[in-house]
Amino acid sequence: MSELFSRRLALLGEPANQSLLRHCLHGIERECLRVDAAGELARTPHPAALGSALTHPYITTDYSEALLEFITPAETDSAATLAALERVHRFACAKLDGEYLWSPSMPCPLPAEEDIPIARYGNSHIGRLKHVYRKGLALRYGKTMQCIAGIHYNFSLPEELWPLLQRAEGDVRGVRGVRDFQSERYIALIRNFRRYSWLLMYLFGASPALDKSFLRGRPHHLQELDAETLYLPWATSLRMSDLGYHNNAQADLTPCYNDLASYTDSLRRAVSTPYAPYAAIGTQRDGEWLQLNTNVLQIENEYYSTIRPKRVTASGERPIQALVARGVQYVEVRCLDIDPFLPLGIDLDEARFLDAFLLFCALEDSPCLAAGECASCTGNFLKVVKEGRRPGLHLQRHGQPMPLAAWAGELLERLQPLAALFDRAYGGDGYEKALHAQQAKVADPELTPSARLLATLRERGESFRAFALRQSLAHAESLRARPLGEEERQAFEAEARASLAEQAELERRDTGSFDDFVAAYQASIQGDGG
């Protein structure tokens, strides 16, 4: 344990600071495909009973019209976050007529590319911009790839923590420097996340198999489990592997996480720099928009990463602008698979473990990534998603081979005092129990969700698609068996109606042409200070 880590732990453990961790904020976004009773992709529009996907605060769509996304408010207790996620699931399940939420991350059998519906957001300029952006994604990466679903976990440390740490560490930049100190600490968290996120893939990866149709006949290195199912025997998360997808445009885009400025500069260049193959296609054909621009990235969010530094944006503000103007506010973890054994795709044990893991990443010493270390982090991550449960698997640590099981055990041991801090802050032993559940998975890989999924397929002689549909129907039944109370149901219905009215108002208020709107949106990223 580093001296710096010990000092920070001791500071948080002081009686006056013990309650601080109760002010962490936790939010969850869960994506899931809508399917029909046969487990085929729903071709119906986003249900009006769920409100407007453009303006509803808790229910939207991601890439496809059939790819729902449920969003919780930021809560000070992970248990409250999970409760909010469950409420929105119960509401949605009650409103889906003959349709179901697909339980795993990897998609159901998909129709031909041209028949996968891209999400629509109405006729306002901002609604059309979101649709054209998704058309651009189809052009660049194909629609099939965009139908993979995941869990995003948003986490922030208490605002009061930063000046406390800053003073304790002798940082004399004063009040104005707190924002920069906070951003530096979040970027340091992200560096450590890059070093250790392979552990999350081992513990929570839940996509070792997929439906054969997903690969569309492309060459691959997967094995056949049955006539409909492909898999890798030791894989944890095929979702986070390359699966044969290579996007050359993003290959050279490796934002440096050594400071916020280099990260935002790297993204700004990517959203401003033309990429020849995209330029050859152009933005419009016969007056129809094909993509927002021909740059490496159309917008910042197109960059695929396992974790992002975030700041809540004002209306009309872009993510880079918000980060440059006000610094990092929270992180968004983006590498989590949906657990198909759980109705919500995530449970409280996982959320609590993530809290402790992210606090560890924030407090642990985090030097800048040395030459070659980035490649080593990526290598470890890819190794674990493809063969994380292989007996005797070694990863690279400081240029030396290290057994995964030993390193994982060591990391979990170091999380013990952080789990204890959270339990002291909240009362009870929920965090310690969550940690023990993960230690059991390291001791016995058969307890991991990836191993459990493959064991279930083998024991039942079941294909991936049959298993996934069975789980989807079972989860729908359990959620529908506990309908919302009348008051909660009415509140959700009112929210849905209000969102539809808000979308209509946006459409009514729009002025000028869509072309001018896109041009102004593009221009907003150029020449920002920072």
Swiss-Prot record:
Catalytic activity: L-cysteine + L-glutamate + ATP = gamma-L-glutamyl-L-cysteine + ADP + phosphate + H(+)
GO terms for biological process, alphabetical: glutathione biosynthetic process
Top enzyme class: ligase
Pathway per the UniProt entry: Sulfur metabolism; glutathione biosynthesis; glutathione from L-cysteine and L-glutamate: step 1/2
Enzyme Commission designation: 6.3.2.2
GO cellular component: cytosol
Coiled coil: none
Protein name: Glutamate--cysteine ligase
Organism expressing this protein natively: Azotobacter vinelandii (strain DJ / ATCC BAA-1303)
Gene (name only): gshA
